[in-house]
């Protein structure tokens, strides 16, 4: 009996020690709030300077405008209105952000990655084809669904994902991410529109393409910015 108790105690201690090494992508707040400020005379924490708590107002936690449709008159036929720490400074250290996604018929957010956050989306209007691809550990498996109003889909952190309007009307969705600043890496923009450009000969070999095709694609991606506001 004594040996069993010692074993259980040792196991609990190991679990507690292991939990201290768990890494959070957005650290937990160390105070009630830590509103972002561009000032340089404050203590630097969690990636942003903190505003003097005595100067914080309700507006630091407020944004108005997600009811306004985004402009989908672009090459992709889509628009993302991000509401992250840059628009709501009170999100600093809270580990969340939200966005409105608008899609014209046939519009899409092409394959991209959020390097610092998992994501969940809720379709409000229209029809969306969404999905993500697993890593090489799981043989690049595609997980995809057709979503309709009221449907929800989750995307793991750091995996390639996409969203496309496969319906005949405009589509609208709300996306929530687990970071105040999740970042976005559109695969096409990063590979073919980097600054400076990657040597087209390297990309031609990597993607088994003619080098002239690579140069053409680079011209397309380097001349147009991504549609995230």
Curated annotation (Swiss-Prot):
Entry-linked Pfam families: Cupin_1 (PF00190)
Cysteine pairings via disulfide bonds: 34-50
Site (Probable non-functional manganese-binding site): 119
Keyword Signal: yes
A GO MF label: manganese ion binding
Residues making up the signal peptide according to the UniProt record: 1-24
CC annotations in GO: apoplast
All residue ranges annotated as the Cupin type-1 domain in the record: 64-215
InterPro entries documented for this protein: Cupin_1, Germin, RmlC-like_jellyroll, RmlC_Cupin_sf
Family, similarity comment: Belongs to the germin family.
Function (record text): May play a role in plant defense. Probably has no oxalate oxidase activity even if the active site is conserved.
Name of the protein in its database record: Putative germin-like protein subfamily 1 member 2
């Amino acid at each position: 009996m004594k040996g069993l108790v010692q074993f259980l105690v040792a196991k609990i201690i190991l679990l507690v020690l292991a939990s201290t090494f768990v890494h959070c992508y957005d650290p937990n707040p160390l105070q009630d709030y830590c509103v972002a400020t561009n000032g340089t005379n404050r203590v630097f924490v969690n990636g942003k300077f903190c505003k003097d708590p005595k100067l914080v107002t309700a507006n630091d936690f407020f944004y108005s405008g997600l009811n306004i449709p985004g402009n989908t008159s672009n090459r992709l036929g889509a628009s993302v209105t991000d509401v992250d720490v840059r628009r709501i400074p009170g999100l600093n250290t809270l580990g969340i952000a939200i966005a409105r996604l608008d899609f014209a018929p046939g519009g899409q957010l092409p394959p991209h990655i959020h390097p610092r956050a998992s994501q969940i989306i809720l379709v409000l209007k229209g029809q969306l084809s969404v999905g993500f691809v697993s890593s090489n550990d799981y043989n690049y498996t595609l997980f995809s669904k057709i979503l309709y109003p009221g449907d929800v889909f989750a995307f793991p952190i750091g995996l390639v994902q996409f969203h496309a309007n496969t319906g005949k009307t405009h589509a609208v969705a709300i996306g929530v991410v687990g970071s105040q600043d999740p970042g976005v890496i559109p695969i096409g923009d990063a590979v073919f529109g980097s600054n400076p450009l990657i040597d087209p000969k390297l990309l031609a070999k990597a993607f088994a393409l003619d080098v002239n095709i690579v140069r053409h694609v680079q011209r397309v991606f380097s001349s147009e910015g991504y549609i995230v506001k």
